[in-house]
A protein has these predicted regions:
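Donor nucleotide-activated moiety binding/catalytic core segment of transferases
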Residues: 388-441
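N-terminal pre-catalytic "stem/leader" segment of glycosyltransferase-like enzymes
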Residues: 13-234, 533-534
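Conserved catalytic-core segment of nucleotide-activated headgroup transferases in glycan assembly
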Residues: 179-201, 319-398, 508-517, 534
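A nucleotide-sugar donor-handling region in carbohydrate enzymes
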Residues: 138-154, 284-353
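Short acidic-hydrophobic, aromatic-tinged amphipathic segments that line or gate anion-handling sites
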Residues: 221-229, 313-315, 409-418, 470-488
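Active-site and donor-binding regions of nucleotide-sugar-utilizing enzymes
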Residues: 174-318
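Catalytic binding pocket for nucleotide-activated donors in carbohydrate/polymer assembly enzymes
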Residues: 438-507
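C-terminal amphipathic helix plus adjacent low-complexity
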Residues: 490-534
């Protein structure tokens, strides 16, 4: 059992964490802290001068030193933040280095300023004028590096704000992730820009700025925030901006959501039954864009009660690129099957990936007499273990592809993962094998059959926990009966009508590019509608 001292320390640490969190994410809390600390410093100065007057009647030196001291301590009592930088914004030169180099640590100077501020208050109250002058001079020396860095920050923010005012963006696409950017940002940027309005991307991870931009090749200007995101965005949220969009569940987005003059809209990066599609953090958003009624039902099913009026149903704009089946699967002589396993998640609770048994799945597909398009989640390419594993899995398809005694014509590796979009992979395939993934929801637009591998639940619980599975064929993690299930899907397909019904629940009534056009029109409307809070 923890001691009393340990409990006190734990409570203190929790309170400090709460205060820091509010300072980083809440404008009103930050303003209150600023006013409170300023009032405290002024009060300390007044007390010191009053004591001085009582001691020897001297006023001029005490008042002058107190005023200068309060200003110096107020300006230099916190570490200076690293400045933001921007790429692709007219009027602002490209940075020479990305990410920007870390500035020198001013922590020791900040600590010195605080202690010297206390010493100055004592000196003003009791010490001779010469001592007051010495302490004040030391305070000025300690504050100088901090103030110099803060001046650099102020100039950077001012130049960026001026350029943004001239550019007149209507929306911000906030991104606090890292490796998933090519998928998450790339998924939505074209559809946001189709509104005809200008926007900017705000990235919260400066160390990934160069990597993300190289992979995404964004059409919008990219702002990489400094270490004080909320401070940057208070100045960079220019009057033309009405809406912030979010495609990722990064906790860092709370810093952006501290800006209350705009509306905050959740887009997500795919419709699935993973926790990221029904997170309690979504309660904070002003508007949630959902593809269909199934998305709203998902929140309710998981106890996340969000008022219905905060949802807007716009289908999946990306599904317009997915073509419907030209021929029923039962009439295709040699079907092509897309195997698209999801990634392994951030932990056990979010790990639904079938990659652990991918070799057995690929082998079963080859034995079923189909061609295979193997497109694992791109995150696997960045992990050393999975990169080696992918080499082994690709070799299975390579061997069958190169064997003159087999008719197999497969796609894998760079061609399938980076050369083709997800929609292209879908359009080249007649059936899908996946797990708990938004790929399945998008696949519904094709009306083609799909098989889902349940890595966590038994099959009865799987259909209940993941409703989209009801329109597909299912096997458990042991792949029990996989050959028979594949045969049923490829040669009889009794679930065709169920898929058509499920498509409306998941993707809405939209056909073709109707969802994309509805989304861009809605974005344009939001971009030109100022946010008014009660």
């Amino acid at each position: 059992m923890p001691t009393l001292l340990e409990r006190v320390r734990a409570r203190r640490d929790r309170r400090l964490h709460e205060v820091r969190h509010l300072f980083r994410t809440d404008v009103s809390s930050r303003d209150r802290w600023f006013l409170g600390s300023s009032a405290g410093l002024i009060a300390a100065g007044v007390v010191a001068v009053s004591v001085r007057v009582l001691v020897d009647g001297s006023l001029v030196v005490g008042v002058a030193a107190a005023v200068v001291g309060v200003l110096l301590v107020r300006a230099a009592m916190l570490r200076p933040a690293t400045p933001p930088h921007v790429h692709g914004l007219p009027g602002v030169p490209e940075p020479e280095v990305c990410p920007a180099p870390e500035p020198p640590d001013r922590g020791p100077f900040v600590v010195a300023v605080r202690w010297l501020g206390a010493a100055l208050a004592f000196a003003v109250a009791f010490a001779p004028a010469a001592v007051v002058a010495v302490v004040l001079a030391l305070l000025a020396v300690a504050a100088a590096p901090v103030l110099r860095d803060k001046a650099v920050l102020w100039r950077a923010r001012r130049a960026l704000r001026r350029a943004l005012v001239a550019y007149e963006p209507r929306f911000v696409l906030g991104y606090g992730g890292y490796g998933g950017g090519p998928i998450h940002v790339g998924m939505w940027e074209p559809h946001l820009l189709a509104s005809g309005d200008r926007g900017v991307i705000v990235g919260l991870r400066g160390h990934y700025c160069a990597e993300l931009r190289a992979a995404i090749k964004p059409a919008m200007p990219w702002i990489s925030t400094g270490s004080d995101v909320l401070g940057d965005m208070r100045g960079l949220t220019v009057p033309s901006v009405t809406t912030f969009f979010y495609v990722h569940n990064a906790p860092g987005h709370l810093k952006l959501m501290g800006i209350r003059s705009v509306r905050h809209v959740w887009l997500g990066h795919g419709d699935s039954d993973k926790a990221g599609s029904h997170h309690k953090r979504h309660l904070r958003y002003d508007v949630l864009v959902a593809s269909g009624e199934a998305a709203i039902d998902r929140y309710t099913r998981h106890g996340v009660e969000i008022p219905r009026e905060r949802f807007v149903l716009l289908g999946r704009p990306q599904s317009g690129e997915v073509l419907p089946a030209a021929t029923p699967i039962t009439e295709v002589a040699r079907p092509t099957v897309l195997y698209a396993p999801t990634w392994t998640g951030n932990g056990k609770m979010t790990n639904f990936s079938s990659m652990y048994i991918a070799d057995r799945i690929l082998t079963a597909l080859l034995e079923a007499g189909v061609d295979v398009v193997f497109r694992p989640h791109p995150v696997f390419l960045r992990d050393a273990y999975w990169a080696q594993r992918l080499t082994e899995l690709n070799a299975i398809l390579q061997a069958d592809h190169d064997d003159p005694s087999t008719p197999g014509r497969h796609a894998w590796g760079e061609e399938a993962v980076r050369g083709w979009s997800v929609a292209e992979c879908m359009n080249r395939s007649d059936a899908l094998v996946s797990d708990v993934s938004s790929v399945v929801s998008d696949w519904l637009a094709s009306a083609k059959p799909y098989l889902m591998v349940s890595m966590v639940h038994d099959l009865d619980a799987f259909a209940e926990a993941v409703p989209v599975a009801a329109g597909g064929y299912m096997v458990d993690r042991d792949l029990t009966g996989l050959p028979e299930v594949l045969d049923e899907m490829l040669h009889r397909d009794p679930l065709a009508e169920k898929r058509r019904q499920l498509k409306v629940q998941v993707l809405g009534e939209y056909e073709g590019d109707e969802s994309a056009r509805a989304f861009s029109a809605w974005v344009h409307e939001m971009a030109h509608t100022p946010m008014v809070r009660a």
